[in-house]
Amino acid sequence: MKPPSPAVSEKGGEPGIQAVPLHVRVIATRIDRRCHNWSVIQLLTTRFTYRDEGGWRERLAAGEFTIDGNPASPEDILLEGMTLQYHPSDLQEPEVDLHYSVCYEDDALLVIDKSGDLPVHPAGVFYYHTLWYLLAEKYGTIHPVNRLDRETSGLLVVARTPDAAAKLAADSWQKEYFALVHGHFTEVMDAEGSLVRDTASPVRRKRKYIHGGTEGESCRTLLMPEQLFQTHSLVKAKLFTGRMHQIRATLYSLGYPLVGDKLYGVDDTLFIKRAKEGSLTEDDYQKLGMKRQALHSAVLTFRHPETGQEMTFHSPLPEDIRRACR
């Protein structure tokens, strides 16, 4: 199936925002060791947070879930190896900004500069509205090597062969990001410690950074002040590890939440609100300072998987973050 044309605009094009027509999809989840002995409703509310518990119970009552082909109920227990299938009756993917540009292309890899509202991988309600789908339609089988959150703009690398993907994954990279944060960030900080679950947050996936910590996942981020504004700061972040939400959680825990971040910003209840209601109000966005999180993948340096040549790519700060600098 082809993505809608002309949704994709490449170098020199204008961003395109377009809804994909309704498609019939079955979403399957294979139960692994981590979810063994969980109830169906526990799995749905923990792993798929774009609906609240009431929303998932309505879907279950409507008969939209099966376990290995048999009707599922909320309290059914899932065992390792089972398959939970979701047969949504009205799945419409939210609109996103489908714009991306190809910065470099050869037979081994692609370097992509993506918009700040484009999921990379299929997950939850997103399938056709993903960078993976758009690129796979054009280039065939692809292997994203470094991932960015939906609302993180900028550079990422996609391998075009399994061999290139393996070599790139094994290589050491240099990654630099720009983050616009609340408050005045004035000193260079080598933030080395650990990331653990933030048990004080109602959002289970939220993490917090512990400086010098040894429990959880080890992480290290070099944070450097780039420019100060009246109420915000532009911070350059250089990664030495690549943990989930590393920059966002680290800056939040240090007292510098990202502008526009629903989860690691000024109020994480806005993350829950958007998950339940599907959108936020203009007042909410005014509070956040931007409609998406102000994080941009600005510099990537790596070795080409076939030639061994060092390659460096730069992406300028996008206009929406520039407008939010104040």
Positions of the model-derived regions?
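RNA pseudouridine synthases
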Residues: 1-326
